[in-house]
């Protein structure tokens, strides 16, 4: 079983890169044009290349059922997270118009992607199963976010936004995988995609920090104790327990179980901050959820992952 120290050593560099991105933005070393360009580069080139280098031919996706489980759980577990967050928000005194909607979509969804990915790579060297499944799992997460999540925030879904570079890359990667066409891709093409894809992880983590830095404003700590405590209870307590229960008790492939254990330990996702800003939510609530769960998960995540992987054997 991986020890607390081993897992903490894998997590700490991720948070240091996030802190670096936040520092660069707060110091004004990232212009808005540079930041936008980096995000477009990651979304439209680097992330798709990473997906196309990890998914086709991945042993964990040998059976179609593995992809079905991953997508289905990504969707259902996020719906469960939204329900738990809505209930906890009501208990915590939040109401529609005072942050309940934003809290629900923020605390109800974990950072499933580029914070989890380096941990999966580090914890399972030589095994690309959990890493490849993460992107398939992400289809379900994104589907839940752009349907139920956006409906909670605005009253209507936004499926058009679901069709982006990574989504298209996942669909293409699954087609290549299950048709066997990936075997005929020249090595030079695969090597090039792998090189570009490896750039996606550090740059995306850096940009997570930059995005967090962008939304840090005066007054950000107003009502932070109530929101922060509620978010920890939901994201790192109730929702984490739901994800772990799925990992332990459903008839899942082993690599998907491992992925879920890591997912359970993750802090809240950062993208709801952007959604709250774009769709007249309350970005202050979203950034409080992200900041507090990120700090707390730095301590709790190694315990959760070590215990969860130990229980899986």
Name the predicted role of every residue range.
Residues 1-313:
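Alpha-helical transmembrane segments of multi-pass small-molecule/ion transporters
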């Amino acid at each position: 079983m991986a020890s607390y120290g081993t897992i903490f050593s894998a997590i700490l560099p991720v948070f240091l890169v996030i802190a670096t991105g936040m520092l660069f933005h707060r110091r004004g070393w990232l212009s808005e044009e540079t930041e936008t360009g980096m995000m477009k580069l990651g979304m439209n080139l680097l992330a798709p290349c990473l997906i196309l280098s990890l998914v086709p031919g991945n042993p964990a996706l040998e059976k179609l059922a593995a992809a079905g489980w991953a997508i289905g759980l990504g969707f259902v577990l996020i719906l469960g997270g939204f329900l738990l967050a809505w209930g906890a928000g009501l208990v915590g005194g939040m109401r529609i118009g005072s942050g309940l909607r934003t809290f629900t979509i923020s605390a109800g969804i974990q950072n499933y992607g580029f914070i989890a990915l380096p941990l999966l790579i580090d914890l399972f060297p030589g095994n690309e199963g959990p890493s490849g499944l993460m992107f398939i799992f992400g289809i379900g997460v994104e589907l839940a976010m752009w349907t139920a999540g956006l409906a909670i925030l605005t009253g209507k879904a936004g499926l058009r936004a679901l069709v982006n570079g990574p989504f298209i890359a996942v669909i293409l990667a699954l087609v290549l995988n299950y048709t066997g066409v990936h075997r005929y891709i020249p090595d030079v093409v695969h090597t090039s995609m792998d090189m570009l894809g490896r750039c996606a992880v550090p740059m995306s983590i850096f940009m997570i920090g930059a995005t967090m830095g962008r939304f840090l404003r005066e007054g950000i700590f107003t009502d932070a104790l109530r929101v922060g405590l509620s978010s920890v209870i939901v994201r790192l307590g109730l929702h984490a327990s739901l994800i772990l229960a799925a990992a332990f008790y459903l008839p899942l492939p082993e690599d998907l179980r491992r992925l879920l254990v890591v997912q359970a330990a993750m802090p809240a996702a950062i993208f709801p901050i952007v959604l709250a800003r774009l769709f007249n939510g309350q970005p202050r609530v979203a950034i409080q959820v992200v900041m507090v769960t990120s700090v707390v998960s730095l301590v709790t995540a190694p315990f959760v992952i070590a215990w969860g992987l130990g229980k899986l054997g």
